[in-house]
């Protein structure tokens, strides 16, 4: 058991029998009151978020989640199937892939990380950057080049994002999966 003040952002704690990831932890000690830790939490099973305040010396149980490298295999409605290097298959529901679905596409070779809790996959994490191909975008407007000019592009899997004006259909682009934003064009 660890005290609440020992937890940092990114760590996982067992709170009321469920795994909660700490997204933000702020320690506060005022003059007369006891020290407290204000935490922003996200439930790893339901995806629900909350903010709560713990006394600095409240005891919480840390959880260490298992992780395994996997690759996307196929979609069997409503399950996405991932496979590890030993050909074990892991099924995960569409709802548990919030934020990741935008970048999943058939034939992708990116190495992902499956996160396990009690021997069950609860989420999949993509690498921080991935490369995807532009399926469609409007041509750039000549002369409209003051500042950082962006336009909408559609990827092969149907996802849309803002890219630089010089990007064209068929270009490969690098995307930051944490923010979902375009980073750069990849040289062929």
UniProtKB/Swiss-Prot annotation:
Changing residue 52 to V: Slightly decreased binding to EarP. Changing residue 32 to A: Abolished arginine rhamnosylation. SUPFAM superfamilies: Nucleic acid-binding proteins, Translation proteins SH3-like domain. Pathway: Protein biosynthesis; polypeptide chain elongation. It is found in: Cytoplasm. Involved in peptide bond synthesis. Stimulates efficient translation and peptide-bond synthesis on native or reconstituted 70S ribosomes in vitro. Probably functions indirectly by altering the affinity of the ribosome for aminoacyl-tRNA, thus increasing their reactivity as acceptors for peptidyl transferase. HAMAP family: EF_P. Belongs to the elongation factor P family. This is Elongation factor P. The lineage of its organism: Bacteria, Pseudomonadati, Pseudomonadota, Gammaproteobacteria, Pseudomonadales. The gene is efp.
């Amino acid at each position: 058991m660890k005290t609440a003040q020992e937890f940092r952002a990114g760590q996982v704690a067992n709170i009321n029998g469920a795994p909660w990831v700490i997204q933000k932890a702020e320690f506060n000690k005022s003059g007369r009151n006891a020290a407290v830790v204000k935490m922003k939490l996200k439930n790893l099973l339901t995806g629900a978020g909350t903010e709560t305040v713990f006394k600095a010396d409240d005891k919480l149980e840390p959880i260490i989640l298992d992780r395994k490298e996997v690759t996307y295999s196929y979609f069997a409605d409503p399950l996405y199937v991932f496979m590890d290097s030993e050909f074990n298959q892991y099924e995960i529901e569409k709802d548990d892939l919030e934020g990741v679905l935008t970048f999943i596409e058939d034939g992708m070779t990116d190495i992902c990380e499956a996160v396990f809790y009690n021997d069950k996959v609860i989420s999949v994490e993509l690498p921080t950057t991935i490369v995807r191909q532009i399926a469609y975008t409007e041509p750039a407007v000549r002369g409209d080049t003051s500042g950082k000019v962006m336009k909408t592009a559609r990827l092969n899997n149907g996802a849309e994002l803002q890219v630089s004006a010089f990007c064209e259909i068929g270009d490969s682009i690098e995307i930051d999966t944490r923010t979902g934003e375009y980073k750069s064009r990849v040289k062929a």
